[in-house]
Amino acid sequence: MKKSACLLAAAAALALVATPAAAKPWITLYSAPNYGGHSIDIDHPVRDLDHHDWDFGDRAQSARVHGHWLMCAAKNFEGDCVHLNHDTPRLKDYGMNRRADSVRPE
């Protein structure tokens, strides 16, 4: 009985170690449909894609998505917004073609 309890505890500890941590969300925005043109990789909230570090406001036409992201047509996550949780070769299909000004993981 005691041996079974020790084995069970060891198995539980191993399962905790072997479980991968949740992957960090990221999104890659592309300036052309079907993942073409210039691209930027983002792994944190960006309130203003026009900011000098990004200079990508109103340019995105497609996106590769890992995790869940909110994409909004105005700065500071305002205006029309869409939820993205999969690769999107044509943001036009979501009404966001060349409109994204802010993005954040959810």
What is the role of each PLM region?
Residues 2-106:
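Compact beta-sheet-dominated domain cores in extracellular/mature segments
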